């Protein structure tokens, strides 16, 4: 394997149920070792945090806010565009140009689909708080803010 092409959602959920989730301080994000198995310590730590069950949540801001209010984080697959790279943690709606270019195989957007976990929301800001897997040096200490509008667009989430 020479490059990281991301992962598929359902095998990731199955892995969280089987192995669990290691804390970042035990197995930090490092893009140079994506193809290596985690350390035995990471497996041991992860075993204390296994996903117990998965629930399907309707793809709408209101349904996701309800799940969050009930104490459930929501994992989702986001369609990302080049503006994601320069967002500084505030994910903008893609421009019309970005969405049009994404249809051209020669100009495919860099990230494609990317799994992240929605962990909070602010009705005042009309944004979700989302945890990425790229470590604390990315975005706002590993988090980003995604507008409700992004989530409610079936072409983006």
Q: Model-found features: residue ranges?
A:
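Predominantly the structural core of cysteine protease catalytic domains
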Residues: 1-131, 136-157
């Amino acid at each position: 394997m020479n490059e990281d092409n991301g992962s598929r959602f359902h095998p990731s959920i199955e892995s969280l149920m089987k192995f669990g989730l290691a804390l970042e301080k035990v197995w930090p994000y490092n893009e140079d070792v994506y193809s290596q198995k985690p350390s035995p310590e990471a497996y041991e730590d992860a075993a204390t945090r296994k996903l117990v069950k998965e629930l399907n949540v309707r793809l709408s801001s209101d349904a996701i806010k309800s799940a969050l209010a009930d104490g459930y984080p929501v994992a989702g697959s986001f369609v990302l565009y080049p503006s994601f790279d320069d967002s500084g943690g505030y994910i903008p709606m893609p421009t019309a140009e970005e969405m049009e270019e994404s249809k051209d195989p020669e100009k495919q957007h860099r990230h494609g689909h990317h799994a992240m976990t929605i962990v909070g929301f602010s009705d005042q800001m009309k944004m979700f708080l989302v945890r990425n897997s790229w470590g604390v040096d990315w975005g706002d200490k590993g988090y980003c803010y995604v507008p409700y509008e992004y989530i409610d667009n079936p072409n983006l989430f």
